[in-house]
Each structure stands twice: as structure tokens, then as C-alpha cells.
């Protein structure tokens, strides 16, 4: 007797067996349908839906976008691509010469206005925050991009992490991000309210936008980058909480998750299917604002680049970000990076 025939006979002779089969069927359906819907939603977000229209955020209406860490890499690309959409800019970074060059370039290329502020955010100075408030409180600001960030120089055990590096990571990634957001968010709320009450039909549905750069290092616990990983995980919960608070004020708050992108901080120089350059990554981010892409189960969160999104989706669905196997793989990966970095440092020391 075949297995199928045995099942048929059992189902005819046993009510309990039939109930069990129905239970298995319903349970499987309850698991499969949400999975299929999440997968289809990701596909539509990434490949089907049209790009976001930035008229709702005040492009070409004289509004400003504030970008921190604006002089290089991802921050510079955010500035350039927002300028191309018609936003005026406030550029905040450490190196004044780079800011001046970027200001001149974008004003000439896109016919927008750009203001700059050169400050060292790692100093966590009240004077710095007061400068931001006093210089820009009267501007019509509708977008804030919290891009400034710092990681470890190389993967390092937490117990061997230097105090200065640890403090700088927390100050730059967390304290400065929160302080700048506390200054700029009320200005965004005020700008949005003023536009919506102006009587201009084009501005009656105006919204504000706060983007904060997250990381897979915060999504997935990352041994040998423990302080950085924790700082980015903090931003996940903070940003999602802020999204709930500011929804009634018509301000969208999004945490932007990325895997590796070619940049000075990642120390990766070659692009690949999994590693875009800043221009490609920022383009995919601005295209998909307001959609989850790979972060289907995370409110106020977006994993915008297609290969990062699929990678995120697979980890969440098959393992879970806190799974031991994921932690072990992450540890081995960063341990190998540390070994290569230490060997390189030893070679360079001998040459000198």
C-alpha cells in the first residue's frame, strides 16, 4: 500500500486524524500567507512602485534640507541629490574647505542656495548646538538627514576598545544625532504647519522628513564592533519611537538601513552586487522613502538598496537577527577582517 493510500484510509477511519490534518493545513496557511504577502510587498517596493514625488516635502518651494556629515561619501551624495530635486541646503560637517567647495559646486550646478557650518561634532559642545539653532532657526526647513557617524578603526574586542574611540562613537552616533534632531525637528514642524495653512493648494499636503542612517551593524548584533553595533541599535528604537511621536505633525521619520557601501568609514573601495557606491545607494534611498523594502516588519525603517533588502529579508525570515548562527557568522567575518588589518599594520610599522 502506497503512502498516499495509507493516508486516505487513515482519514476515512479516524476523526482525530482528520482534525490533525486540518490543523496542519491551517497552521501552514497562516505561516505561508503572511510570508508571501511580505515578499510581494518587498518586490513591489523595490521594483514596481514609481519613485517618490518630493513635491510633498517642499522641493522647489524654497525649503531647506539639513545634511550632517555632508562633506564626503553618503552625506555628500544626499546633498547633491536633494539639490538636484530643488531643495536649498544646510551642510554641516567638520572640514570647512570641503564644505565651501561643495557649496560652490551645488549652487552653481543646481541654482539653489546652500549654507554651511563647520563644527567638530565629536566635541559634544553646547556652543556647537547653539550655533546650529541661532543660524538656522528662521529658515524654512522641511528635511533633516542625520548622516554623521563613526565606527571603529578596525574590528576590536569590546574589552580592548580604547575609551576615546568608545566615547566618540557614542557621542557622534547618538548624542549629536539626538541633539541636532531636537533643534531641527521643531523647525520642520513649524515649516510644515505654515505651508499647510498658507492656502496654497500645492502646499496643503506638505510633509516633513527626518532620515537617520542606520546600519546592518545595528540590525544584527556584531561581535568585534560591539560599541558601534550598540549605538546603531539604539538609533533603531529611537527613530521608530520618534516616528510614532511626529506622525500627528505630518513628519515622516525613517531609519535607513544599509549593508556595506563604498565609503571612508567602511574602508571598502570596490563596488559589487552587494556593495553599491554612495550615489547608487542614496538614489535608491530617495526613490523609496516611506516604503519598507527589505524591512517589512519594522515600522519607520527602510532597507532601500535591492540586494541589501533581499539579504535583510532572508535573515529575518529564515533565522532571525538574534539567532546564534547569525552571531557566529558575523564574529568569524569580522575576526578575519581584524586579522588582516593587524597584519597590515605590522607590515607598515616594519617598513617605517
Sequence positions of predicted segments:
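Canonical Rossmann dinucleotide-binding motif of NAD(H)/NADP(H)-dependent dehydrogenases/reductases
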Residues: 41-90, 94
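Rossmann-fold scaffold of SDR-type NAD(P)-dependent oxidoreductases
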Residues: 68, 118, 141-150, 173, ...
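Hydrophobic positions on the long internal alpha-helix
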Residues: 145, 180-184, 188, 238-239
Amino acid at each position: 500500500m502506497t503512502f498516499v493510500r495509507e493516508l486516505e484510509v487513515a482519514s476515512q477511519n479516524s476523526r482525530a486524524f482528520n482534525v490533525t490534518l486540518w490543523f496542519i493545513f491551517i497552521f501552514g496557511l497562516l505561516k505561508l500567507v503572511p510570508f508571501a504577502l511580505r515578499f510581494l510587498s518587498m518586490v513591489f517596493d523595490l521594483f514596481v512602485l514609481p519613485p517618490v514625488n518630493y513635491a510633498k516635502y517642499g522641493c522647489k518651494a524654497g525649503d531647506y534640507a539639513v545634511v550632517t556629515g555632508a562633506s564626503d561619501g553618503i552625506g555628500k551624495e544626499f546633498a547633491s541629490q536633494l539639490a538636484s530635486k530643488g531643495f536649498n541646503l544646510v551642510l554641516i560637517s567638520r572640514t570647512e574647505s570641503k564644505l565651501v567647495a561643495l557649496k560652490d559646486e551645488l549652487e552653481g550646478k543646481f541654482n539653489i542656495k546652500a549654507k554651511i557650518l563647520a563644527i567638530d561634532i565629536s566635541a559634544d559642545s553646547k556652543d556647537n548646538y547653539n550655533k546650529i539653532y541661532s543660524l538656522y532657526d528662521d529658515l524654512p526647513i522641511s528635511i533633516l538627514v542625520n548622516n554623521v557617524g563613526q565606527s571603529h578603526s578596525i574590528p576590536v574586542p569590546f574589552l580592548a576598545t580604547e575609551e576615546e574611540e568608545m566615547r566618540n562613537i557614542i557621542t557622534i552616533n547618538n548624542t549629536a544625532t539626538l541633539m541636532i534632531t531636537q533643534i531641527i525637528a521643531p523647525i520642520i514642524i513649524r515649516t510644515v504647519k505654515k505651508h499647510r495653512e498658507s492656502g496654497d493648494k500645492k502646499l496643503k499636503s506638505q510633509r516633513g522628513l527626518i532620515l537617520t542612517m542606520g546600519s546592518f551593524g545595528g540590525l544584527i548584533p556584531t561581535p568585534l564592533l560591539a560599541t558601534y553595533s550598540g549605538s546603531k541599535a539604539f538609533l533603531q528604537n529611537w527613530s521608530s519611537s520618534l516616528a510614532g511621536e511626529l506622525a500627528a505633525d505630518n513628519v515622516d521619520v525613517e531609519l535607513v538601513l544599509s549593508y556595506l557601501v563604498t565609503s571612508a568609514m567602511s574602508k571598502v573601495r570596490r563596488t559589487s552586487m552587494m556593495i553599491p557606491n554612495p550615489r547608487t545607494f542614496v538614489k535608491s534611498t530617495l526613490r523609496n522613502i516611506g516604503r519598507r523594502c527589505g524591512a517589512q516588519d519594522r515600522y519607520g525603517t527602510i532597507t532601500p538598496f535591492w540586494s541589501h533588502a533581499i539579504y535583510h529579508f532572508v535573515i529575518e525570515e529564515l533565522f532571525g537577527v538574534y539567532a546564534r548562527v547569525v552571531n557566529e557568522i558575523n564574529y568569524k567575518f569580522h575576526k578575519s577582517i581584524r586579522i588582516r588589518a593587524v597584519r597590515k599594520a605590522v607590515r607598515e610599522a616594519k617598513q617605517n
